[in-house]
Amino acid sequence: SCLCYEVSDRDGEEKCLQAIQENADFITECEKNKDPMLAAMFGGHALFTISDKTFDRMVEANNGRTGYHIHVSEGMNDVYDSLQNYGRRPIQRLQDHGILGDKTILGHCIHVNTAEMEIIQHTNTMVVNNPESNMGNAIGICPVLQLHKRGILLGMGTDAYTNDMLESLKVALCSQRSQNCLPNVGWCEVTDMLFRNNAKIGEKYFPVQLGVLKPGAAADIIVMDYKPFTPFSDENIDGHMIFGMTGR
């Protein structure tokens, strides 16, 4: 597991300071134990619940030891709050505080503009799309095609909306085609996100190769109880994953 605790100003300064300390203590514990199955990030909620003062405290407590996990531009309220109260968009604000980097994960990134995508790209920051959660909350669709085209490391998550990653895969594909009004886009992008990029994201935190079957790699294997109704081969396995299988 790679874990963190969500820092927020929502419950007052005392709780916020406790959350910051919880992250710092857990990072220290992981550094001491060096358990290859356990890693730490520094968690934050969303920018509209985190003040500049709190960001400074988070960065000081982290001291460059690990990356950050934070919800970004999930809804337009995050963008409006950032512009109104801080005079800049969310991604710029994160960059100004030193939050971005190649071990930081930005959740959602639905309402990011071109300039923000460039910052994400140039800082090698990771993004994780949560298609079902975003649709369920009616807050928009992540610009997956544009992010993928820029070479941004883009993974797939759930935001705790489901525990079925193949369900998320289906929804990710359908949402991108619906959003772009094109019936032939998204296939390569969403399969890359789940089967390749998620492993690359994991490798940022665990000292073993993931997502491949080869000597020395992690035993990153699941067995599916699946009876295909049409021919099944290595040439059409993605189609069976999307249209035939479930994760349950």
Predicted regions and their residues:
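Glycine-enriched alpha-helix->loop->beta-strand junction motifs that scaffold or abut catalytic
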Residues: 62-67, 99-102, 119-128, 149-154, ...
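Alpha-helical segments flanking ligand/cofactor-binding loops in enzyme cores
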Residues: 56, 92, 117-118, 145, ...
